[in-house]
From Swiss-Prot:
Belongs to the bacteriocin class IIA/YGNGV family. Signal peptide: none annotated. Antimicrobial activity is lost upon treatment with beta-chymotrypsin, proteinase K and papain, but not when treated with lysozyme or lipase. The keyword Repeat does not apply. Pfam families: Bacteriocin_II. This is Bacteriocin SRCAM 1580. GO terms for biological process: defense response to bacterium; killing of cells of another organism. Thermostable, activity is retained after incubation at 100 degrees Celsius for 15 minutes. It is found in: Secreted.
Amino acid sequence: VNYGNGVSCSKTKCSVNWGIITHQAFRVTSGVASG
C-alpha cells in the first residue's frame, strides 16, 4: 500500500521514500519562508 506521503507498506514491511519526504518538507519550508 502506498499512502502517498513517501511511506509504502506491504504485508511484511514498511519502507519510507526519504526523497519524497525531503521534497515535501522543502516545499513546505520554502512556502513558509516566502509567505
